[in-house]
């Protein structure tokens, strides 16, 4: 069930139309990385096409079939050799557009999967992943 703006050209048109009607850059796009993976989107190309319109992201991982909301880098194939989501392409696309917007981890199912007594360590890991993404996106 692809939703509105799953097609990047439609998303660009829609955001540009809304901003033109507003008379200023009032609207931007929220990229749900897990949903893009479910619909086999090339993240790098999708991000590049959005360009400056990309304002925030919901970052999470899945198996390519179900919207699981797990930690980035969680799902691999070929005995751990290949990630299901092209995280390198994702980072490259963000670097190419000079992304400096917000990131949001959508990992609630991951949190519910672990015992409460390890939640502090899990939150530390999520924070470390956030630093990883920021450093990779902004590296010179």
Stretch-by-stretch model annotation:
Residues 1:
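Divalent metal-binding pocket/active-site signature
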